[in-house]
């Protein structure tokens, strides 16, 4: 349960950081903006001390996860789900 909470917090932090970066003008058409957002991957990296909750849950340091709208890539495995703007995506980790 702690792992899920920590993963969710990291995902929300990554999404918040990405949302703050300027990605174009506000006059873009919503359909065009949606297409751009679907093509982008969100990278989440895990690391830290040996005493972290992620390490306690058998998650190794250096694991990188992506929130994907399509299937997981080569050498990635499905590790759960992530949500963005009301849509559910695959959480793929390597």
Curated annotation (Swiss-Prot):
Signal sequence segment: 1-19
GO molecular function terms attached to this record: protein homodimerization activity
Disulfide bonds: 65-93, 67-82, 72-92
UniProt keyword Cell membrane, yes or no: no
Cell compartments where the protein resides: Secreted
PROSITE patterns named among the record's database cross-references: DEFENSIN
GO annotation, biological process: antibacterial humoral response; antimicrobial humoral immune response mediated by antimicrobial peptide; cellular response to lipopolysaccharide; defense response to bacterium; defense response to fungus; defense response to Gram-negative bacterium; defense response to Gram-positive bacterium; disruption of plasma membrane integrity in another organism
The keyword Heme belongs to this UniProt entry's keyword annotation: no
Tissue specificity field: Highest expression in bone marrow and to a much lesser extent in small intestine.
Family statement drawn from the similarity comment of this UniProt entry: Belongs to the alpha-defensin family.
Protein name as catalogued: Neutrophil antibiotic peptide NP-2
Organism: Rattus norvegicus (Rat)
Gene from which the chain derives: Defa
């Amino acid at each position: 349960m702690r792992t899920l909470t920590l993963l969710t917090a990291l995902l929300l932090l990554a999404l918040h950081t990405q949302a703050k970066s300027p990605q174009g003008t506000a006059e873009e058409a919503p359909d065009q903006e949606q297409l751009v957002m679907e093509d982008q991957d969100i990278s989440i990296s895990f690391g830290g001390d040996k005493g972290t909750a992620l390490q306690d849950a058998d998650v190794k340091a250096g694991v990188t996860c992506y929130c994907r709208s399509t299937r997981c890539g080569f050498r990635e495995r499905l590790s759960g789900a992530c949500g963005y703007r009301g849509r559910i995506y695959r959480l793929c980790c390597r």
